[in-house]
UniProtKB/Swiss-Prot annotation:
Its EC number is 3.1.-.-. This is Apoptosis-enhancing nuclease. A motif (Nucleolar localization signal) lies at residues 27-35. GO terms for biological process: intrinsic apoptotic signaling pathway in response to DNA damage by p53 class mediator; response to ionizing radiation. GO terms for cellular component: nucleolus; nucleoplasm. It comes from Pongo abelii. The lineage of its organism: Eukaryota, Metazoa, Chordata, Craniata, Vertebrata. InterPro entries: Exonuclease_RNaseT/DNA_pol3 (IPR013520), REXO1/3/4-like (IPR047021), RNaseH-like_sf (IPR012337), RNaseH_sf (IPR036397). Its main location: nucleus. Exonuclease with activity against single- and double-stranded DNA and RNA. Mediates p53-induced apoptosis. When induced by p53 following DNA damage, digests double-stranded DNA to form single-stranded DNA and amplifies DNA damage signals, leading to enhancement of apoptosis.
């Protein structure tokens, strides 16, 4: 007996359902991203209209000033002189052409990060990484995982971190998370608020030339009244510049929300910030890595050590000093 073929309407039922669903998902995602971008551009235009944010330079405007004594690429070529290398005894000149226009990092090379910490060690006073979130230039979440600290947790700091005991059930080890996170940060311009806290929790030092700490955003604003203090909180900056309320409620901070907000703040002053970076690179062409000695010294501080170990370390230091004298 030859089996009957399925009706034509039944055969094409699955494709007709799956394809529109996929298109609908992509269409909704595009609309959501477009609305977010429109809100961001509206805030930026409002700040520029109020004079809180300077307008970007128009095409064809005057180039950035050349530092005194610097030799431009044109002058060097016309003179026929070879530019000395840094450290060869002569004055080093830039490896880059004279900047006529500040170009920021490509969106694919710019990410924002935020970390949440819990308390370990004596009295829970040692901060260790418990959650890390990384978002892209456009606000897409690239990484968001809970992380199990290397030492037992004494204080979850839920009011601020939002971390609870239940979150640790699905947490990954710190060493695994560290490798995954540093792989995402490598070669990227990293944006964040008070980044030294995040990098210290990661036990990592990022190049200064690729770091954009949003605590310095007020420095790029033309309104002096916003220069209230040296370190303005992310919550205050979001409210003043983005008209956005964050870190509300009793469930603690969201590292995804904080990272996204930091990226929005950076994009408000991106043109001015990258112009300044271009000037500093032209003045000091060699991308010097940060001096990690000061960061390592923080890990060697004994202020959180048990009393017996701290007493022994201080006693040993005094004995060594006496022997040198």
């Amino acid at each position: 007996m030859v089996p009957r073929e399925a009706p034509e309407s039944a055969q094409c039922l699955c494709p007709s359902l799956t394809i529109p669903n996929a298109k609908d998902v992509l269409r909704k995602r595009h609309k959501r991203r477009s609305r977010q971008h429109q809100r961001f551009m509206a805030r930026k235009a409002l700040l520029q209209e109020q004079g809180l944010l300077s307008m970007p330079p128009e095409p064809g405007s005057s180039p950035l000033p050349t530092p005194f004594g610097a030799v431009t690429a044109t002058e060097d070529a016309s003179s026929g002189k070879q530019c000395p290398r840094a450290g060869s005894g002569g004055a080093p000149c830039s490896r880059r052409p004279a900047p006529g226009k500040a170009s920021g990092p490509l969106p694919s090379k710019c990410v924002a990060i935020d970390c949440e910490m819990v308390g370990t060690g004596p009295r829970g006073r040692v901060s260790e990484l418990a959650r890390c979130s990384i978002v892209s230039y456009h606000g897409d979440v690239l990484y968001d995982k809970y992380i199990r600290p290397e030492m037992p947790i004494v204080d979850y700091r839920t009011r601020w971190s939002g971390i609870t005991r239940q979150h640790m059930c699905k947490a990954i080890p710190f060493q695994v998370a560290q490798k995954e996170i540093l792989k995402l940060l490598k070669g990227k311009v990293v944006v964040g608020h008070a980044l030294h806290n995040d990098f210290q929790a990661l036990k990592y030092v990022h190049p200064r030339s690729q770091t954009r700490d949003t605590t310095y955003v007020p420095n790029f604003l033309s309104e002096p009244s916003l220069h209230i203090r040296a370190r303005v909180s992310l919550k205050d900056l979001a409210l003043q510049l983005l008209h956005k309320k964050i870190q509300v409620g009793q469930h603690g901070h969201s590292s995804v929300e904080d990272a996204t907000t930091a990226m929005e703040l950076y994009r408000l002053v991106e043109v001015q910030w990258e112009q300044q970076e271009a000037r500093s690179l032209w003045t000091c062409p060699e991308d010097r890595e940060p001096d990690s000695s000061t960061d390592m010294e923080q890990y060697m501080e004994d202020q959180y050590w048990p009393d017996d170990l701290a007493h022994g370390s201080r006693g040993g230091a005094r004995e060594a000093q006496d022997r040198r004298n």
